[in-house]
């Protein structure tokens, strides 16, 4: 296909238009008084949502070059979401500010590569300062505060805190849709392991890039499945029992994987293939744990069994299995409670006997997976649109809470970034590198400015007041007051703030040193025939 190419100033104009279009759409959601955005769906009612990354993922621009700018900024939000689960709108706001300020300086004659160096040095200093300013999460009340701010609902804050109190900070928590009208929690047998789906073709929820399998039948094996010949006899047997199949194997590849994908796409089989966790003997032990939890048996090469020997008794069952690219969660396995207790006793005995610290740690992980179970938060609402919006807020609140526990917290509402600004004074740079630092300095006020603007205030006035306030003091947009942010319960996870800054700067640096764009020339679709052409050949 023929290509269209643009250079220099045209590149910056196109990228800026794309960046601004996406960022202007998303930034209205920032803060407690942010406004939601309605997303059109191919079927059903529009989704009304205030989650930055979800909105960004839905945006595609008609102009190919402008769309490149939008997609690059979208990448900042996606990376932040993957790393910290929150802060996606902040990362987009920061990226837009960095890019626009950098383009102004490039137009005035600044050298892009030197601006990039200055931005990188400023961000490195800020990250170190954010870590210094961070304080650990203390007690359940601060967990409530973090979850409440991100979820924008005290009920969500208390819900997350209660669940984490029961399953522990590393416990497995899943979020489901419910037919009820309120939030409900339950604790079920289950486990989570650090392996995801083998192919993205198994995804059932493209928005979250997850594969969700209800009433799952599970085939577990320590074999590598490569050919159709070894897979087909087992599939034919299983299809007589269930159409919802999850295969957990050492690997599924080559023509075997292609066969599963084709059958999935054609709708012949609702299937998910997942790599087995661990390696060697540990993999065998974890597969056995999984089999006991789900009431099945492992098709083991050590026992001389092949896939075609599978029987109904070998298949495990679970109410629900959720898998993404990194991890898989088995919820409500149908294994015998007595067998699970016996397995836990066996692992405890191994922990007491082992002398290896590494082996002990891995055994404790297996024990925790079987003992801890899975907490399930069911989200209900009066309409499907409201339920999806609520579910997204609960997911964001859970991710932010985990981030806060891991790296600590900072004053919220954009105050954490402003408090870190003085560290840039220690950077003794010259020329365009110093300009790069000033670009970052200007960009860091944007989150506070947009939180205030979305609350109906003059953003610049609010920024000046916060800058002149004591450290840790900021603007509470919810109640329209200034004060100590921590005392008011307005706190942000350090990981969220750091990730938003880091990813925004990374994408901005890519954009500002880009000097040419290449895109396909879109062919115009042929005009539809007129009425007089009907029936002609």
Swiss-Prot record:
What is its subcellular localisation? Cytoplasm
InterPro entries, per database record? Chaperonin_Cpn60_CS, Cpn60/GroEL, Cpn60/GroEL/TCP-1, GroEL-like_apical_dom_sf, GROEL-like_equatorial_sf, TCP-1-like_intermed_sf
The record ties this protein, via CDD domains, to: GroEL (cd03344)
Q: Where is the signal peptide?
A: none
What SUPFAM superfamilies would the database entry show? Answer: GroEL apical domain-like (SSF52029), GroEL equatorial domain-like (SSF48592), GroEL-intermediate domain like (SSF54849)
Catalyses: ATP + H2O + a folded polypeptide = ADP + phosphate + an unfolded polypeptide
Q: Name one Pfam family in it.
A: Cpn60_TCP1
What family is this protein classified in?
Belongs to the chaperonin (HSP60) family.
> What is the designated name of this protein?
Chaperonin GroEL
């Amino acid at each position: 296909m023929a290509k269209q190419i643009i250079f220099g100033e045209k590149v910056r104009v196109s990228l800026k238009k794309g960046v601004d279009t996406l960022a202007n759409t998303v930034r209205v959601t920032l803060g407690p008084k942010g406004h939601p955005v309605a997303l059109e769906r191919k079927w059903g009612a529009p989704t009304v949502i205030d989650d930055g990354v979800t909105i960004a993922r839905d945006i595609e621009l008609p102009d190919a070059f402008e769309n490149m700018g939008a997609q690059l900024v979208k990448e900042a939000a996606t990376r932040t979401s993957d790393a910290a689960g929150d802060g996606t709108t902040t990362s987009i706001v920061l990226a837009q500010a960095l890019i626009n300020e950098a383009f102004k300086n490039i137009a005035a004659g600044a050298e892009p590569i030197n601006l990039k160096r200055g931005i990188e040095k400023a961000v490195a200093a800020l990250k170190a300062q954010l870590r210094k300013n961070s304080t650990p999460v203390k007690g359940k009340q601060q967990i409530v505060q973090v979850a409440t701010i991100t979820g924008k609902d005290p009920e969500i804050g208390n819900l997350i805190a209660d669940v984490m109190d029961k399953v522990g900070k590393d416990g497995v928590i899943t979020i489901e849709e419910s037919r009820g009208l309120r939030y409900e929690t339950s604790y079920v047998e289950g486990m989570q392991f650090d392996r995801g789906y083998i192919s993205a073709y198994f995804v059932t929820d493209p928005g979250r890039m997850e594969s969700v399998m209800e009433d799952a039948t599970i085939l577990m094996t320590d074999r590598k499945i490569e050919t159709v010949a070894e897979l087909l006899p087992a599939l034919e047997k299983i299809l007589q029992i269930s159409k919802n199949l999850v295969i957990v194997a050492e690997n599924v590849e080559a023509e075997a994987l292609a066969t599963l994908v084709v059958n999935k796409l054609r709708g012949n089989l609702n299937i998910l293939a997942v790599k087995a966790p661990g390696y060697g003997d540990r993999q065998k032990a974890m597969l056995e744990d999984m089999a006991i939890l789900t009431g099945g048996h492992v098709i083991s090469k050590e026992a001389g069994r092949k896939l075609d020997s599978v029987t109904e008794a070998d298949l495990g069952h679970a109410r629900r299995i959720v898998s993404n690219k990194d991890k898989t969660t088995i919820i409500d396995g149908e294994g015998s409670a007595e067998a699970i207790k016996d397995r836990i006793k066996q692992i405890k005995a191994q922990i007491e006997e082992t002398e290896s610290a590494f082996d002990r740690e891995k055994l404790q992980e297996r024990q925790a997976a079987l003992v801890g179970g899975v907490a399930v938060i069911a989200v209900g609402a009066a309409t499907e649109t409201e339920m999806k919006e609520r579910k997204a807020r609960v997911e964001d609140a859970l991710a932010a809470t985990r981030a806060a526990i891991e790296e600590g917290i900072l004053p919220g509402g954009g105050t954490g970034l402003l408090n870190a600004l003085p560290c840039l004074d220690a950077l003794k740079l010259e020329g365009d590198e110093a300009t790069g630092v000033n670009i970052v300095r200007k960009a860091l006020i944007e989150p506070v400015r947009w939180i205030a603007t979305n609350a109906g205030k003059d953003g610049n006035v609010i920024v000046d007041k916060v800058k002149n306030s004591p450290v840790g003091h900021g603007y509470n947009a919810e109640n329209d007051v200034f004060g100590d942010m921590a005392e008011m319960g307005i706190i942000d996870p350090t990981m969220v703030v750091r990730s938003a800054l880091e990813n925004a700067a990374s994408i901005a640096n890519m954009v500002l040193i880009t000097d040419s764009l290449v895109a396909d020339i879109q062919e115009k679709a042929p005009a539809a025939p007129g009425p007089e052409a009907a029936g002609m050949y």
